[in-house]
């Protein structure tokens, strides 16, 4: 065919090209595509190129970030893109006395159990709204307590707090002096909630401005929760299936999801790994103080 169009190619050149087979680079690309698919499947299919690259290298699969980016483009893959949806879950009572804002939008903590943030969000289901309460440790971004309910009741937030207290004290961790930050919602200003904080020597802090930036870290988690779990896997039937999925999501979020905002150098690490590293380093110092 080529010779008919004036292309002079030696027969041996043609047959060598035809029988050469797949190149080493092409074989490597096919292998990496399979690994990319696996990593994404193990992580709710929400990872973009950066996290896929980080996870592959954590597993000893050495590959350049640009290679992962190229292959994911070829595969038509991208990470979860976050947007914003809004439904009011805060019911402020402007007449009620509230604690001071001890955080002032500076969501930084030098160690675990120095600063928790708590907030409520919502999930639309065929059976109506499901409301979710979360408590997050600012140091590691670990979700330490959570609870779901079909009603936006005061006990919803309290149940999440109880789980957080139980999780930390069960591990032998001290909560004295911990600051608990929330918005102005009546759920967090209730008498029983305030009493439970005081019983554990936890100091209450409430945002002073009355907008989403008052509790930006909790809002950021809600965005991840929605765009990594709720929207991709919906629609939802009701409370039971949302609760079951949330249980798996929190376990993944705390122990396997890579976070790039926790460390000073923006390296990827899980909340559980970050806390474990802190206690390994702080252990000798804590022992020296108590001796």
Segments (PLM) and residue ranges:
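RNase H-like polynucleotidyl transferase catalytic core
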Residues: 81-87, 148, 179-184, 198-217, ...
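Active-site beta-loop-alpha junctions of metal-dependent nucleic acid enzymes
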Residues: 95, 128, 147-172, 189
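Short conserved beta-strand segments at catalytic cores or DNA/RNA-binding microdomains
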Residues: 120-151, 162
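C-terminal domain-tail junction helix/linker
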Residues: 191, 198-202, 226-291
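Structured, non-catalytic alpha/beta "coupling" segments that mediate domain-domain communication
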Residues: 1-15
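Mobile genetic element proteins and their domesticated derivatives, centered on retroelements
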Residues: 14, 36, 52, 68, ...
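Basic, flexible linker segments flanking DNA-binding modules
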Residues: 11-111, 269-282
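Acidic/histidine-rich, metal-coordinating catalytic segments
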Residues: 172-189, 208-210, 263-270
């Amino acid at each position: 065919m080529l010779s008919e169009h004036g292309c002079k190619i030696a027969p041996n050149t043609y047959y060598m090209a035809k029988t050469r087979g797949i190149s080493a680079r092409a074989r490597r690309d096919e292998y990496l595509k399979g690994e990319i698919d696996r990593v994404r499947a193990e992580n709710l299919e929400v990872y973009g190129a950066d996290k896929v690259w980080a996870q592959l290298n954590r597993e000893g699969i050495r590959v350049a970030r640009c290679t992962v980016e190229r292959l994911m483009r070829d595969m038509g893959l991208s990470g979860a893109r976050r947007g914003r949806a809004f439904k009011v879950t805060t019911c402020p009572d402007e007449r009620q006395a509230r604690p001071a804002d001890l955080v002032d939008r500076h969501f930084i903590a030098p160690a675990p159990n120095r600063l928790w943030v708590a907030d409520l969000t919502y999930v639309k289901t065929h059976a109506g709204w499901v409301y979710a309460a979360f408590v997050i440790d600012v140091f590691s971004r670990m979700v330490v307590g959570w609870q779901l309910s079909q009603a936006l009741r005061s006990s919803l937030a309290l149940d999440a707090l109880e789980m957080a207290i139980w999780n930390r004290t069960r591990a032998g961790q001290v909560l004295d002096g911990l600051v608990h930050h929330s918005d102005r919602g009546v759920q967090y200003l209730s008498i029983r909630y305030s009493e439970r904080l005081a019983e554990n020597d936890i100091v209450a802090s409430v945002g002073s401005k009355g907008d989403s930036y008052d509790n930006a870290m909790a809002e950021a988690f809600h965005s991840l929760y929605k765009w990594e779990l709720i929207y991709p896997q919906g629609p939802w039937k009701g409370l039971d299936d949302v609760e079951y999925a949330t249980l798996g999501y929190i376990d993944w979020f705390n122990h396997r999801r890579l976070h790039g905002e926790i460390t000073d150098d923006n390296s990827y690490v899980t909340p559980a790994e970050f806390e474990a590293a802190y206690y390994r380093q702080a252990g000798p110092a804590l022992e020296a103080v108590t001796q």
